[in-house]
């Protein structure tokens, strides 16, 4: 909305500042943070009042969780999504279609996660929406978004998988890219969902990935920078940096309340939405493979679950003491702060590795 102040710049030259994506990204970040700081306590109190016993804790998990996390409300993703939405609506260019496509995926996945959390809390069980139903809805949302991105973009780039490290090497998948893109978005959403198991574990790597893709979006959406770095120019995607800024701000606000011992969990409401957002941005800016590097921590968590389930079904034996892998380290005696901070360090290193691909051509 504030973007429209540019129209008054002839009378008020100071309003020219709203032309700059960097300025509006900073504004979105501050707005998202302030919103969560201001309304977070009220949201937490209401969720605690309405949920009663809070998020059900796994009885087969680390026994310490039954004592330290019992009664903690979930659905904290509502705080993040509210701050993200307010920051985006206020500061992003309302005429940019990429903004609305990514925001639609984010809120759509957030709704799926919210309903899943609602089922778990009301029934006090880990069985929310059936896995098949949840995946079906996610694929419908992601597929529609990827179809829009392919239709909106410049052919053949919009329907191609770009290979990093090489100049102009890409695989044109045609409309099959819609299916591939949907897998990227759904995979990212569920990978972040699996990572969200300890206080602060998911939100910081999400913010690191968001900062990385905010930079990538800005560069890919700028013809000069894209040509210099020899990456594919995708007109209009620079505006996605504003969304990433809003997420960073809202994430910082949420971390204030999610720091151990957490006052609230983001739940599926937050983790599915944020993962879906990262996946859809990666598809929009044509850096799907780079997402697997920058979000390597999420990939590791997801792969650990896949390996654990496959191994147990095929051999009757478990590879890890418990999956996802952060619980494996808990069972090995690592403290929660050790796991969380070490995983943060890994996330930073992976983000730097992913960003380095921008120059390696």
Curated annotation (Swiss-Prot):
Molecular function via GO: metal ion binding; phospho-N-acetylmuramoyl-pentapeptide-transferase activity; UDP-N-acetylmuramoyl-L-alanyl-D-glutamyl-meso-2,6-diaminopimelyl-D-alanyl-D-alanine:undecaprenyl-phosphate transferase activity
Key word Membrane present: yes
Name the UniProt record assigns to this protein: Phospho-N-acetylmuramoyl-pentapeptide-transferase
The EC number(s) this enzyme carries: 2.7.8.13
Reactions performed catalytically: UDP-N-acetyl-alpha-D-muramoyl-L-alanyl-gamma-D-glutamyl-meso-2,6-diaminopimeloyl-D-alanyl-D-alanine + di-trans,octa-cis-undecaprenyl phosphate = di-trans,octa-cis-undecaprenyl diphospho-N-acetyl-alpha-D-muramoyl-L-alanyl-D-glutamyl-meso-2,6-diaminopimeloyl-D-alanyl-D-alanine + UMP
Cellular component, GO annotation: plasma membrane
Membrane topology field: Multi-pass membrane protein
Matches recorded under HAMAP family: MraY (MF_00038)
Metabolic or biological pathway, per its Swiss-Prot or TrEMBL entry: Cell wall biogenesis; peptidoglycan biosynthesis
Segments passing through the bilayer: 25-45, 72-92, 95-115, 135-155, 169-189, 200-220, 240-260, 264-284, 289-309, 338-358
Described purpose of this protein according to its UniProt entry: Catalyzes the initial step of the lipid cycle reactions in the biosynthesis of the cell wall peptidoglycan: transfers peptidoglycan precursor phospho-MurNAc-pentapeptide from UDP-MurNAc-pentapeptide onto the lipid carrier undecaprenyl phosphate, yielding undecaprenyl-pyrophosphoryl-MurNAc-pentapeptide, known as lipid I.
Localization: Cell inner membrane
Cofactor: Mg(2+)
An example Gene Ontology biological process: regulation of cell shape
Gene behind this protein: mraY
Organism: Rhodopseudomonas palustris (strain TIE-1)
UniProt family annotation: Belongs to the glycosyltransferase 4 family. MraY subfamily.
Highest taxon, organism lineage: Bacteria
Keywords: Cell cycle, Cell division, Cell inner membrane, Cell membrane, Cell shape, Cell wall biogenesis/degradation, Magnesium, Membrane, Metal-binding, Peptidoglycan synthesis, Transferase, Transmembrane, Transmembrane helix
Keyword Manganese: no
PANTHER family: PHOSPHO-N-ACETYLMURAMOYL-PENTAPEPTIDE-TRANSFERASE (PTHR22926), PHOSPHO-N-ACETYLMURAMOYL-PENTAPEPTIDE-TRANSFERASE HOMOLOG (PTHR22926:SF5)
Pfam families found in the cross-reference section: Glycos_transf_4, MraY_sig1
């Amino acid at each position: 909305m504030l973007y429209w102040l540019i129209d008054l710049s002839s009378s008020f030259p100071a309003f020219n500042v709203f032309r700059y994506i960097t300025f509006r990204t900073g504004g979105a970040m501050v707005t998202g943070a302030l919103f969560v700081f201001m309304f977070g306590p009220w949201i937490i109190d209401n969720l605690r009042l309405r949920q009663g016993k809070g998020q059900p804790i796994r009885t087969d998990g680390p026994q310490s969780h039954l004592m330290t996390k019992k009664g903690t409300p979930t659905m904290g993703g509502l705080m993040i999504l509210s701050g993200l939405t307010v920051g985006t609506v206020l500061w992003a260019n309302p005429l940019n279609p990429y903004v609305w496509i990514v925001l639609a995926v984010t809120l759509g996945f957030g709704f799926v996660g919210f309903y899943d959390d609602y089922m778990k809390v009301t029934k006090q069980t880990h069985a929310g929406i059936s896995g098949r139903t949840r995946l079906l809805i996610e694929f419908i949302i992601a597929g529609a978004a990827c179809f829009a991105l392919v239709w909106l973009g410049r052919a053949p780039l919009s329907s191609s998988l770009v290979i990093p490290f090489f100049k102009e090497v890409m695989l044109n998948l045609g409309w099959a890219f819609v299916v591939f893109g949907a897998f990227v978005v759904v995979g990212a959403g569920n990978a972040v969902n699996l990572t969200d198991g300890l206080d602060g574990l998911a939100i910081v790597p999400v913010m690191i990935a968001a900062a990385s893709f905010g930079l990538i979006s800005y560069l890919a959406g700028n013809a000069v920078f894209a040509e210099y770095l020899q990456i594919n120019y995708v007109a209009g995607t620079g505006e996605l940096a504003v969304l990433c800024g809003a997420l960073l701000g809202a994430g910082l606000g949420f971390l204030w309340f999610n720091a151990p011992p957490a006052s609230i969990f983001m739940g599926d409401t937050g983790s599915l939405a944020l993962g879906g957002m990262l996946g859809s941005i990666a598809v929009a800016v044509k850096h799907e493979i780079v997402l697997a590097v920058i979000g390597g921590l999420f990939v590791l968590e997801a792969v650990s679950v896949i390996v654990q389930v496959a191994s147990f079904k095929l051999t009757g034996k478990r590879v890890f003491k418990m999956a996802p892998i952060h619980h494996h380290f808990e069972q090995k005696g690592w403290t929660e702060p050790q796991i969380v901070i070490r995983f943060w360090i890994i996330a930073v290193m992976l983000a730097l590795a992913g960003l380095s691909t921008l120059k390696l051509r």
